[in-house]
Amino acid sequence: MNFKFARFKSIFNILFILIIAFPGGLIYLLTGSTLSFWLRESDFDKITIGLFGLVNFIHIFKFLWGPLLEKISFSTLSNRGYKYCLVITLINCIFCVYVLTSFNPNTNFIPFVLCLVVLAFFSSIYDMLIQSSQMLLITDKNWGISEAACTTGFRIGILISGSGALYLSTIISWQDVYRTMAILCIPSLLLIIFYPLKFKDKIIDNDFDRFLNAFYDFIKKPKCIVIISFMLLYRLQDSFLSIMPNMFYLDIGYTKQDLAVGYKAFGMCATIFGGVIGGFLCRKYEYSYLLKRVLIYHALSSLSFIYLYFLNQDITSLYIAVFCQEFTKGLTMSPFFSYQLKCCSSRYCITQIALITSITNVGTILIGSISGYAATYLGWSYFFIVAGLCFIPAYILILYLPKTINSV
């Protein structure tokens, strides 16, 4: 009887993670890819649009407030403290999205950018809380599945704020589109408020020494420098591409309606499918083997951009190219994020997850911010060739990753 109860509890926790990941994905695109379409229609050039990626630079520093979150979340309030953090953070995200709609990027440039930065700040906190919830609620043998669920929820959010927002923008203004996205976050907020959280382990009260202990615990792991370098470079290809595929598809003649269905909606389904397959593969294959294989598959997907550019630009070709790109992207995510969790200790989960994702975001944000320059001066063909070669540094580092990691 206890076994059946534990099994149902695990399933409900995984579903909870899926649903609370939805606003994270939805908000993610509102400061990224979807924003680029709004800026493009406001007559900003590729270089400026690429530089807008720097509003997410604050994600790099989220490891600094990770210990503070642990202090608040894992105090004597325990489960309630963690829930309060989730609720307050999501409310602030919704509020910032709504305030953003009060500004025009052309006439209110500085307030517009500042509001985006504040939104990115609260979004980074929410992402930390989502990721750490997997470690706190899910047993380690189910991390691959929980990450697939988290990726699925995140990607559904991206689907709504990507395909849905793009389609809505053909009917209503971008300001109204963003207001609609803010409203769609409310059901997840209500679930967080009413869902009974219960951690799998007893959480130890925090003190300031844990700030340093969390970093020391991570640094003393075998081959720490290799792990950090790997985290920094694994998603180099996606970082280099950044939001430029949006501009590419528009430049070669596809309409927003084509992209809403063929790129955003279909592409998101392909990414989710890839994420689910990747999650189950995590249970079957050893990490280094799987990470190498999916990295190569994703690198080869860059050929689909070149195919579209030189050979064929019809709707069928768009679907084929998008499937190659997005399925392999999803395939890389589950093993990568599961490996991130494996590198963390449960007693310092928020701080260490924040540290790891901050390292990952350094490459994503800094490299992504120059993608506009690269696309402008290299041209589309050479731009995608360089993107395809970006897998090489991470592939080499995988060969030197430690075989075992202490994540207690």
From Swiss-Prot:
Pfam families to which the protein is assigned, alphabetical: MFS_1
Its membrane topology: Multi-pass membrane protein
Keywords on record: Cell inner membrane, Cell membrane, Membrane, Transmembrane, Transmembrane helix, Transport
Molecular functions (GO terms): transmembrane transporter activity
Primary localisation category: membrane
Domain of life per record: Bacteria
GO cellular component terms, A-Z: plasma membrane
InterPro entries: AmpG_permease/AT-1 (IPR004752), MFS (IPR011701), MFS_trans_sf (IPR036259)
Subcellular location per the Swiss-Prot or TrEMBL entry: Cell inner membrane
Transmembrane segments: 11-31, 49-69, 84-104, 110-130, 154-174, 177-197, 224-244, 261-281, 294-311, 353-373, 382-402
Homology family: Belongs to the major facilitator superfamily.
Protein name (record): Putative transporter AmpG 2
Organism: Rickettsia prowazekii (strain Madrid E)
